[in-house]
C-alpha cells in the first residue's frame, strides 16, 4: 500500500523535540527522511541508543557529520541539492554559517521547500534567544 509522501526526500537538520517529532510524522507518512546528526552536538538524548532518540527518529536514515569541517558542510549542501524538503530548527544564523540557508540552497535546488522553526522567529527583538522545544 502506498503512503501519501512516498517518493518525497526530506533532509532533516533538527534536534530536541519539535523538529524530530515533525519529521518523524513525515517519515511515518512515507517520506524518505535523512537525519543529519552533528557529532559535535552529541548529548545523551542524541545518541542512537537512547530511547528518546529512538522514539523521535524512527523511520529515518541517519548520517553523523562534523559540521565544524568544510567537507561535512559541502556534503550537506550536496544532499540539499537532492532534497524535496529541507527542515531545521537551529537557532537563527546557524545554517547560514554552514551555507545551508534558503537562499543558498535555492540557487541549486529551485523547487526546494525549506522549513525553519527557530524558537523565536528569524527577526525581531527575541530572535537571538536560544530556545529548546
Locate each region found by the language model.
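N-terminal helix-loop segment corresponding to the beta1-alpha1 unit
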Residues: 1-133
Amino acid at each position: 500500500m502506498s503512503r501519501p509522501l512516498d517518493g518525497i526526500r526530506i533532509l532533516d537538520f533538527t534536534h530536541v523535540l519539535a523538529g524530530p517529532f515533525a519529521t518523524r510524522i513525515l517519515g511515518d507518512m512515507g517520506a524518505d527522511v535523512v537525519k543529519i546528526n552533528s557529532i559535535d552536538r552529541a548529548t545523551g538524548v542524541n545518541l542512537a541508543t537512547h530511547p528518546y532518540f529512538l522514539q523521535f527518529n524512527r523511520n529515518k536514515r541517519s548520517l553523523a557529520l562534523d559540521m565544524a569541517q568544510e567537507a561535512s558542510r559541502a556534503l550537506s549542501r550536496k544532499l540539499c541539492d537532492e532534497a524535496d524538503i529541507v527542515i531545521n530548527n537551529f537557532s537563527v544564523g546557524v545554517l547560514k554559517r554552514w551555507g545551508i540557508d534558503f537562499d543558498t540552497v535555492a540557487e541549486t535546488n529551485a523547487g526546494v521547500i525549506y522549513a525553519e522553526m527557530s524558537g523565536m522567529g528569524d527577526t525581531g527583538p527575541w530572535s537571538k534567544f536560544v530556545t529548546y522545544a
